[in-house]
Curated annotation (Swiss-Prot):
The keyword Calcium does not apply. NDH-1 shuttles electrons from NADH, via FMN and iron-sulfur (Fe-S) centers, to quinones in the respiratory chain. Couples the redox reaction to proton translocation (for every two electrons transferred, four hydrogen ions are translocated across the cytoplasmic membrane), and thus conserves the redox energy in a proton gradient. The lineage of its organism: Bacteria, Pseudomonadati, Pseudomonadota, Alphaproteobacteria, Rhodobacterales. It comes from Dinoroseobacter shibae (strain DSM 16493 / NCIMB 14021 / DFL 12). Keywords: 4Fe-4S, Cell inner membrane, Cell membrane, Iron, Iron-sulfur, Membrane, Metal-binding, NAD, Quinone, Translocase, Transport, Ubiquinone. Binds 1 [4Fe-4S] cluster. It catalyses: a quinone + NADH + 5 H(+)(in) = a quinol + NAD(+) + 4 H(+)(out). GO terms for cellular component: plasma membrane; respiratory chain complex I. This is NADH-quinone oxidoreductase subunit B. Transmembrane segments: none annotated. It is found in: Cell inner membrane. Its EC number is 7.1.1.-. The gene is nuoB.
Length: 177
């Protein structure tokens, strides 16, 4: 019933030794992983997004939460407060007057925080790009993790962007050492 130590005698290749030990323990009903992997797995399955809807893209954003697309089945739930959310979705035309409010809301979010820029206006100013009062992309105010193109992007495109964010979180890891 004991675990053999052959995995520990595999030499300097720790990854190979870990894989051997993991294969042996799986047959006995155990899982070998790291704390960082568990935290990232939990983080991707419980994203709480906050809307920062500024224009017509916000209507498409609402469709993502409705029964047809149901983002909650992927562990992505809406929240009203920035202090309870991990993800901010910026949708619509960001004006110079609204930019400080966007930054203030972003600063109120707990770490780690992510931003999705939704639509042509949020990505780069869109139709109003040459207007004197429009910020040419919300990435000039806050760091953006995922860009969702379109005018307005469909609910499927936003859902795909949210799933890509989950994939990015799993791939990169966010624990500071």
């Amino acid at each position: 019933m004991g675990v053999s130590t052959a995995a520990y005698d595999a030499g300097p290749d720790k990854e190979h030794a870990t894989q051997l030990l993991n294969n042996e323990l799986q047959d006995k009903g155990f899982l070998l992983t790291s704390t960082e992997d568990i935290i990232n797995w939990a983080r991707t399955g419980s994203l709480h997004w906050m809307t920062f809807g500024l224009a017509c893209c916000a209507v498409e954003m609402m469709h993502t939460s409705m029964p047809r697309y149901d983002a909650e089945r992927f562990g992505i739930a809406p929240r009203a407060s920035p202090r309870q959310s991990d993800v901010m979705i910026v949708a619509g035309t960001l004006t110079n007057k609204m930019a400080p409010a966007l930054r203030k809301v972003y600063d109120q979010m707990p770490e780690p925080r992510y931003v999705i820029s939704m639509g042509s206006c949020a990505n780069g100013g869109g139709y109003y790009h040459y207007s004197y009062s429009v910020v040419r992309g919300c990435d000039r105010v806050v760091p953006v993790d995922i860009y969702v193109p379109g005018c307005p992007p469909t609910a499927e495109a936003l859902l795909y962007g949210l799933l890509q964010l989950q994939r990015k979180i799993r791939r990169t890891g966010t624990i500071v050492r």
